From Swiss-Prot:
Catalyzed reaction equations: tRNA(Thr) + L-threonine + ATP = L-threonyl-tRNA(Thr) + AMP + diphosphate + H(+)
UniProt GO BP: threonyl-tRNA aminoacylation
Top EC class of this enzyme: ligase
Gene that produces this protein: thrS
UniProt organism field: Streptomyces avermitilis (strain ATCC 31267 / DSM 46492 / JCM 5070 / NBRC 14893 / NCIMB 12804 / NRRL 8165 / MA-4680)
GO CC terms of this entry: cytoplasm
Protein name: Threonine--tRNA ligase
Length: 658
């Protein structure tokens, strides 16, 4: 046997090793049970891959991003095998790994039931214990079609080899190169147990799957298109250990408690009636209070920062979106046109920026007016497929806190710095404090403007972001075609990351709208345009805060800041007078004068997550005082009336949590 020289790469360490022909990647890492694959020359390979002379080989740990994807993809195969053993008529769709888990689509006569999922999970456990070996083999297109003749969706994937999309998961099955099938082989006999069209890589055996659980099933269109058949999708999750699986399930349970759709109903904040339509919310009185307070505070802070408020209509002639380019770039996200005025197309607006450009262009502008900061709570409408609409976080009609800033090239860096600082400070005011920034840069295949302008703008954004002292994560190629952007990513109380604010440079719209201002020398010059959405949308930010606080808003945002709870009927009037005085100070106070017993009233207030429960009995009336009960059950007694009102007002004014 001839010698083979390979380089073992581990982080920054490189080790040259001489092995014999036929050595596999697994042979390079004996006893390392957490290694599930290898990266060879930058490509992921199974551990069964035979290394070649001169190759660089890096172990892939199961806990790494690639390792988790391999674990979850292999578990998806086990699930598909289990489904076809239990439901032989089931036809296979696609089964990719996704964030924190995996799914597989099936064409079956009836939707899966909860009992079916339990049976499938039990069968998966049996397959896992069998230790079946994942074995890769290369096949021709013709051979693949012959082997998979009974799988119509696999045949379709073979036909699109080379153009498979990452968006619909097809690229996990077929790529631009050779076709491969993965066989699940019996650990003892080597007999074929099951097979699937797949690019891989996979775990060595099913025994390498430490912990998994099936989560739910849902309907899904084949490859995400409503024109295609409806399939049944089963979601699952898989982790490197049982402890990590348990931690994930605990996290999901906590997230479910905080689900804004659930809390919105329990706290009577908003609803999404079927009679109106998916993705179109109505805010109830209590939710309306929270939203108004959010908007009022934002409006005040914007005024302090020199923004000017504007209002624009909800619909416009289609010609405006031809000028802006939205009909070229964004038509699929817009609602269909309405033909009015003798056949003129009108559209519901998906964005506010074209109308703000018309405001800028309504008269001549001088450099002395710049920066011009236009701001609007502008309601927009975007067509989202029903499968992606999700409560308030992915809606079809929503209100953006939308600003567009027009400034000179010389003032661009200063304005970006001020804008980002303002954005972060305002988010902190609402209680979000854990951030990192993401810098989205040019997609070399899709951009307008010169390379020089992009480089200057990107470097300016980078410097502005670095000044904040926050982690800066690159997003290569992630920018829109019209300019680079900074995204503010915020973590909530349970560690989830939400994209909040964006600060986006735009080289496209000033050109399309021929926007100009008169410079100091009298010449006409093109302004720099900055898009800035701080909340993203009011509805989405409302949902994020609702989940962040688990419905227990700080007093300044709470729809009811204090509720009076009389110990008996004789104390109702006393608390009503207290409430009247508190309302004069601008506080939102109610008195529970129902016939419920006091303990029931306290439970009701706790369920509604009211910050202050103000309790009064005979002793309180005699002393001219009240008692405070807080959300955590603690209590403070004998607080004089004026002091009690002042204390609530102070907590509201300082925007602190109690």
């Amino acid at each position: 046997m001839s010698d083979v020289r390979v380089i073992i790469q581990r982080d920054s360490e490189r080790e040259e090793r001489v092995v014999t022909t036929g050595t596999t990647a697994a042979d390079l890492f004996p006893g390392e049970r957490t290694v599930v694959a290898a990266r060879v020359g930058g490509e992921l390979k199974d551990l069964a891959y035979e290394v070649k002379d001169g190759e660089e080989v890096e172990p892939v740990q199961i806990s790494s991003e690639d390792g988790l994807n391999i674990l979850r993809h292999s578990t998806a195969h086990v699930m598909a095998q289990a489904v076809q053993e239990l439901f032989p008529e089931a036809k296979l769709g696609i089964g990719p790994p996704v964030k924190d888990g995996f799914y597989y689509d099936f064409d079956v006569a009836k939707p899966f039931t909860p009992e079916d999922l339990k049976a499938i999970e039990k069968k998966m456990q049996e397959i896992q214990k069998r230790g079946q070996r994942f074995s890769r083999r290369v096949v021709t297109d013709e051979a693949a079609r012959e082997e998979l003749a009974d799988e119509p969706y696999k045949l379709e994937l073979i036909g699109i080899k080379g153009s498979a999309s990452n968006d619909d998961g097809a690229n996990v099955e077929v790529g631009s190169g050779e076709l491969t099938i993965y066989d699940n082989l019996d650990a003892k006999t080597g007999d074929l147990c099951w097979k699937d069209l797949c690019r891989g890589p996979h775990l060595p055996t099913t025994r390498n799957i430490p912990a998994f659980k099936l989560m739910r099933n849902a309907a899904a269109y084949w490859r995400g298109s409503e024109k295609n058949p409806m399939l049944q999708r089963i979601y699952g999750t898989a982790w490197p250990s049982k402890d990590e699986l348990k931690a994930h399930l605990d996290f999901l349970a906590e997230a479910e408690k905080r689900d804004h759709r659930k809390l919105g109903n329990e706290l009577d904040l908003f609803s999404i009636p079927d009679q109106i339509g998916s993705g179109l919310a109505v805010f109830h009185p209590k939710g309306g209070i929270v939203r108004r307070v959010m908007e009022d505070y934002s409006r005040r802070r914007h005024e302090e920062e020199g923004y000017e408020f504007v209002y624009t209509p909800h619909a416009t002639k289609g010609k405006l979106f031809e000028t802006s380019g939205h009909l070229d770039w964004y038509a699929d996200g817009m609602y269909p046109p309405m033909q009015l005025d003798e056949g003129v197309d009108y559209y519901l607006k998906p964005m506010n920026c074209p109308m703000h450009n018309l405001i800028f262009d309504a008269r001549g502008r001088s450099y002395r007016e710049l920066p011009l900061r236009l701001f609007e709570f502008g309601t927009v409408y975007r067509y989202e497929k029903s499968g992606v609409v999700h409560g308030l976080t992915r809606a079809r009609g929503f209100t953006q806190d939308d600003a567009h800033i027009y400034c000179t090239r010389e003032k661009m860096a200063d304005e970006l710095d001020k804008t980002l600082t303002f954005v972060l400070n305002l988010l902190r005011d609402y209680g979000l404090t854990d951030f990192y920034l993401e810098l989205s840069t040019k997609d070399p295949e899709k951009f307008v403007g010169s390379d020089e302008v992009w480089e200057e703008a990107t470097e300016t954004l980078r410097q502005v972001a670095e000044k904040q002292g926050l982690p800066l994560v690159p997003d290569p190629g992630g920018a829109a075609f019209y300019g680079p952007k900074i995204s503010v990513q915020a973590k909530d109380a349970i560690g989830r990351t939400w994209q909040m604010s964006t600060v986006q440079l735009d080289f496209n719209l000033p050109e399309r709208f021929d926007l100009e201002y008169t410079g100091p020398d009298g010449s006409k010059q093109r302004p720099v345009m900055i898009h800035r959405a701080l909340f993203g949308s009011i509805e989405r930010f409302f949902a994020v805060l609702l989940e962040h606080y688990a419905g227990a808003f700080p007093a300044w945002l709470a729809p009811v800041q204090a509720v009076g709870i009389p110990i008996g009927d004789a104390h109702v009037e006393y608390l009503q007078k207290f409430a009247a005085e508190a309302k004069k100070k601008g506080l939102r106070v109610e008195v529970d004068s129902s016939s419920d017993r006091m303990q029931k009233k306290i439970r009701n207030a706790q369920k509604q997550k009211v910050p202050f429960m103000v309790i009064a009995g005979d002793e309180d009336m005699t002393a001219g005082a009240v008692s405070f009960r807080y959300r955590d059950g603690s209590q403070e007694n004998g607080i004089p009336l004026d002091e009690a009102i002042a204390k609530i007002a102070k907590v509201v004014e300082e925007r602190t949590q109690v």
